[in-house]
Curated annotation (Swiss-Prot):
Protein name: Hemoglobin subunit alpha
Species the sequence originates in: Gorilla gorilla gorilla (Western lowland gorilla)
Record-listed heme b binding positions: 87
Modified residues (Phosphothreonine): 8, 108, 134, 137
Entry GO MF terms: heme binding; iron ion binding; oxygen binding; oxygen carrier activity
Annotated function: Involved in oxygen transport from the lung to the various peripheral tissues.
Record-annotated Globin domain positions: 1-141
InterPro entries with a match to the protein in the record: Globin (IPR000971), Globin-like_sf (IPR009050), Globin/Proto (IPR012292), Hemoglobin_a-typ (IPR002338), Hemoglobin_oxygen_transport (IPR050056), Hemoglobin_pi (IPR002339)
Positions where N6-succinyllysine occurs in the chain: 7, 11, 16, 40
Record's keyword annotation contains Metal-binding: yes
Amino acid sequence: VLSPADKTNVKAAWGKVGAHAGDYGAEALERMFLSFPTTKTYFPHFDLSHGSAQVKGHGKKVADALTNAVAHVDDMPNALSALSDLHAHKLRVDPVNFKLLSHCLLVTLAAHLPAEFTPAVHASLDKFLASVSTVLTSKYR
């Protein structure tokens, strides 16, 4: 459960991401594909090379979903319901992959926002991404 301080930290950190959200989303995906090659199996139709338009496009989708989750941090289950349905029923993404992408997002944010990425912000973002992952996997049951 996100505390009021966590919510404040997440909103402030995501506010710093701003216009770079899509780029950071794409970078996190690239990190995931390189670090965890099995995740590529969900994207057989993508050009997964560095700078690929398809990876950039999906990175923007990831970032937009996270922006939506930040905006609706108190009601993520409703805000992410359609996305949860998509990943559980149509795409059938293994839930472990959300943890892998979350890790890569944290690394990407730490690399780009070193001054803002304090231990408290790191912990808050980690809890937030875990909450998003929980919501996205809630319809697997």
